[in-house]
Amino acid sequence: MAAKQVLFSDEARAKMLDGVNTLANAVKVTLGPKGRNVVLDKAYGAPTITKDGVSVAKEIELEDKFENMGAQIVKEVASKTADVAGDGTTTATVLAQALLTEGLKAVAAGMNPMDLKRGIDKAAAKLVEELKVLSKPCSDTKSIEQVGTISANSDSTVGKLIAEAMAKVGKEGVITVEEGKGFEDELDVVEGMQFDRGYLSPYFATNQENMTTDLESPYILLVDKKISNIRELLPVLEGVSKSGKALLIIAEDVESEALATLVVNNMRGVVKVCAVKAPGFGDRRKAMLEDIAILTGATVISEDLGMKLEEANMEHLGTASRVQVSKDDTTIIDGAGNKDAIVNRVNQLKANVAEATSDYDKEKLQERLAKLSGGVAVIRVGAVTEAEMKEKKDRVDDALHATRAAVEEGIVAGGGVALIRAQKALDGLVGDNDDQNHGIALLKKAIEAPLRQIVSNAGGESSVVVNEVKAKEGNYGYNAANDTYGDMVEMGILDPTKVTRSALQHAASIAGLMITTEAMVAEIKEDAPAMPMGGMGGMPGMM
């Protein structure tokens, strides 16, 4: 076991803060309408240019192990916020940095770290309650468009596309983002279905960058049982191999031996194949397999109907124009099923929804209905260069997540104003002792940081703007895009409540943990021994 170095108290916390500052300073330049780009070096190909906070955070690894620990912990804030809300990563990082900087000063001054943490936790809970009070529902197309525009760094075209996509497939519908062929952004709505089961092995992935499997015009085999023996699949595999097309297998499960054989055949290029588990459980699984069968024109191979897998042939397979499989879900686009059969199935599901007695059954039936009838909206991002394409695709992804979050939990005034307005909820909040009160005051001050950073990135004087905004009430705030003050909601500057709430909760949680850190342990870096000198060349032979 390698020797370890241990740092204690102020020395440990100072190192940790250095790492946090390095990461946060790189991330926070992207915040707001006048945020700047960050260029990320890649091992292969051109550098990536981005304004996406979490993309910047993910790239940062520091040489000093103690500083790197601090950076990695704050990276977790950005990643967790992105996972939960899909946006707000930069806001979360800025909040965590502000809290930690002031919190460590308080610890150095002799305050009790645990009481500071308890004060921060109390204040965070109160602020979350206040954000819910300030939140307004986001249901109309105009609000959805405004949220999308702000999250895409004030790109109104993106906001319009997302609002249009949601209008076409419904707020629960599936919307995907792809790279387009031309310079213009496009919206395509295609019949499709998505379910929450991913590939059974990562070796099926065809796109190594985002670990997805893309199958063009594949055959689709539906099996209502476990596949344990590869021999059962041979007739189908041989037929598909001769056709030169790909095969998607949807089964209850594929056991290890059969799965290993499929993976090997796939990697050798014998037959392009991907296996996924069937969605749902029990009777619901059978019903969902039947839905997929109707959508794709397949026949479910079911022993209940007296069918055996080894008797299956090409006639039992369905087709679709495209299938995309990730580690978490599968999307079948433009299935080749009979249109009349699909309409009949949709009508049958509508009747079942009307007859359902339990809320749970009703909800599950409505999900199936949306998947069969809603289709999939595809936003194709256009750009002049590949670097611009990647940057824009990241922004559209962010905006899409933000609009979904807005529909889910509502919206608040953007531009850091909601957090400033929530400050008043902390006025009457008192902790159990002075150190807890200081923790409450820390968070009260730290939540001004996002607005201060937006102003700084726009080249303004942050203290002047913060005091001006605090002097007024309601949605009054600062529009950094054109250096004006006014009603943020009327100006269309909105943030999803879920994004602001998640950023605040994750930042407070991580900052509390880091403030209460007393020791850090890391391996001692050993310098690699110098290479020995090469031997000298021999003398040429003499006559």
Swiss-Prot record:
EC code(s) of this entry: 5.6.1.7
UniProt enzyme class: isomerase
Reaction equation(s) it catalyzes: ATP + H2O + a folded polypeptide = ADP + phosphate + an unfolded polypeptide
GO molecular function: ATP binding; ATP-dependent protein folding chaperone; isomerase activity; unfolded protein binding
SUPFAM superfamilies in the record: GroEL apical domain-like, GroEL equatorial domain-like, GroEL-intermediate domain like
UniProt xrefs under Pfam families: Cpn60_TCP1
Keywords (A to Z) from UniProt: ATP-binding, Chaperone, Cytoplasm, Isomerase, Nucleotide-binding
GO terms of biological process kind: protein refolding
Residues the record lists as binding ATP: 30-33, 51, 87-91, 415, 479-481, 495
Protein family according to the UniProt entry: Belongs to the chaperonin (HSP60) family.
Self-association and partners: Forms a cylinder of 14 subunits composed of two heptameric rings stacked back-to-back. Interacts with the co-chaperonin GroES.
UniProt protein name: Chaperonin GroEL
Provenance organism: Francisella philomiragia subsp. philomiragia (strain ATCC 25017 / CCUG 19701 / FSC 153 / O#319-036)
Lineage: Bacteria, Pseudomonadati, Pseudomonadota, Gammaproteobacteria, Thiotrichales
